């Protein structure tokens, strides 16, 4: 069978992923021209490469339409419920680091932890007759973190279609859940991350779709072993 590896199609993620595969003895070349969305691995005739966006890679992995992919852990865990039943996180690759965090306005001086925020959520309902509004693109991770892990129920999620960090200042939300690498954008918007408000330390991962056909396919384990040895 042919094994398909989905890799980022552009930017730093593409360069970093290609470098790791090259160290693993799996040099990747485009089929056709440099702007092609298909590729191959030199010396691995039963492996093909698809160049996709990070969000496309996570979707194709979750649906099982590719065998391997390099994408952010945040995209996989946000995109699918019980994601570990669908895919295996084979290796964390050491690039694409970013944290999914809970951030509140800096002027909330007495709110530093999720417990403090739980008190605020209850107070919002009592004082304003509405629930605390959270702007985010990460509704699944937000619900799991607030409701399942911290027992906070009195909130509502406002879907963020633009720059999430601007939502509190614009009045469309009270707080945010967003992804950040350095925190500089949050600080520029006068937001602070709660002390225990890191939902996920994300980075680029080699992810395998869980397929029965992989059990008897030696090239599957060979790919995993080669990448792990290159880290």
Swiss-Prot record:
Location in or out of the cell: Cytoplasm
Q: One Gene Ontology cellular component annotation?
A: cytoplasm
Give the highest taxon in the source lineage. Bacteria
Q: Principal localization?
A: cytoplasm
EC numbers for this chain? 2.4.2.17
Task: Kindly report, in one word, the top-level EC class recorded for this enzyme.
Answer: transferase
Keyword hit for ATP-binding: yes
Give the Gene Ontology MF terms in alphabetical order: ATP binding; ATP phosphoribosyltransferase activity
InterPro entries, sorted: ATP_PRibTrfase_cat, ATP_PRibTrfase_CS, ATP_PRibTrfase_HisG, ATP_PRibTrfase_HisG_short
- Pathway field: Amino-acid biosynthesis; L-histidine biosynthesis; L-histidine from 5-phospho-alpha-D-ribose 1-diphosphate: step 1/9
What reaction does this enzyme carry out catalytically? 1-(5-phospho-beta-D-ribosyl)-ATP + diphosphate = 5-phospho-alpha-D-ribose 1-diphosphate + ATP
Q: Keywords in alphabetical order, please.
A: Amino-acid biosynthesis, ATP-binding, Cytoplasm, Glycosyltransferase, Histidine biosynthesis, Nucleotide-binding, Transferase
Q: Name one GO biological process term.
A: L-histidine biosynthetic process
Physiological role: Catalyzes the condensation of ATP and 5-phosphoribose 1-diphosphate to form N'-(5'-phosphoribosyl)-ATP (PR-ATP). Has a crucial role in the pathway because the rate of histidine biosynthesis seems to be controlled primarily by regulation of HisG enzymatic activity.
The subunit field of the Swiss-Prot or TrEMBL record says:
Heteromultimer composed of HisG and HisZ subunits.
Q: What is known of its domains?
A: Lacks the C-terminal regulatory region which is replaced by HisZ.
Family of this protein: Belongs to the ATP phosphoribosyltransferase family. Short subfamily.
Would you tell me the protein name for this molecule? ATP phosphoribosyltransferase
Source species of the chain: Rhizobium etli (strain ATCC 51251 / DSM 11541 / JCM 21823 / NBRC 15573 / CFN 42)
